[in-house]
Amino acid sequence: MKKVVCIVGPTGSGKTALSVKLAKSLGAEIINGDSVSIYKKLDIGSAKITTDEMDGVKHHLISHVALDEPYTVYNFQQDVRTLIDQIDKPFIVGGSGLYVKSALYNYEFEQQDNVEFPNINEMIEVIRKADPDIEIDLNNPRRIESAYRTIISGQKRSNKTKKNEPLYDIYLIYLDMDRKILKKRLETRLDLMIEKGFIEETKALINYDLNIIGYREIKDYLNGMNDLDTAKEKIITATMRFAKRQKTWFINQMKPKVYNALSPDLLDECLKDIKEFIGV
């Protein structure tokens, strides 16, 4: 199995800076695992890495698609898998859990073709005849429709590898941080973003439907729905809630090795562990 290093954690935990130092030391390349930084024009508000911050390390899927271009988790999955095959030492860095897991594990996305469904009993009969070994909740119509769609496409559902089976040999680093400290860091970072032109960036994108933390609240401010202090408070509250969900998701779904993001020995600890993992 191809070895892949993955660095995840909440927004503001220091993933970007750590990943660049590690990649530079190991001759690795970084694949962006943040679903917002994939888009062009979303620069300041996404805390997108700059060319200077890359420090010569090759990055992929940064400003990859236009803001009005459809780009799904399936597109991300296919792009990342292609890159993993091409890169000698691939790192994936970001906090978008489903995106990261879909690329590294055997997620299979159902085709969204128009399918005419018979009644439930007829679908169950077709499923049972075509795939006697299937395990499915027959009291769940959506599950039945999904299995039926798969059967008529010519593929047995029971032969599908479960989505919790990894396709690669993964070393997963989760950067953890005390929530009070994280909140302070986020507040400082938000002030810096505004100094850099976050409000102006959002104003230039005002006609886009941006349901993204930060852009959404600044857009409301620009539309006169609240003042700037209220917008900032809402951004921090939403970001902290998101960080809590991120931690729960990664710990439960991907079982990472948890590191203290504020440890003075963090770089040395990660470097040592990754070297052991990749065998250098």
Swiss-Prot record:
One MF annotation (Gene Ontology) recorded for this entry: ATP binding
Disulfides per UniProt: none
Catalysed transformations (reactions): adenosine(37) in tRNA + dimethylallyl diphosphate = N(6)-dimethylallyladenosine(37) in tRNA + diphosphate
Cross-referenced PANTHER family: TRNA DIMETHYLALLYLTRANSFERASE
EC supergroup of this enzyme: transferase
Family classification: Belongs to the IPP transferase family.
Swiss-Prot/TrEMBL site (Interaction with substrate tRNA) positions: 96
UniProt organism field: Acholeplasma laidlawii (strain PG-8A)
Cofactor(s) required, per the database record: Mg(2+)
Protein name, as recorded: tRNA dimethylallyltransferase
Protein's gene: miaA
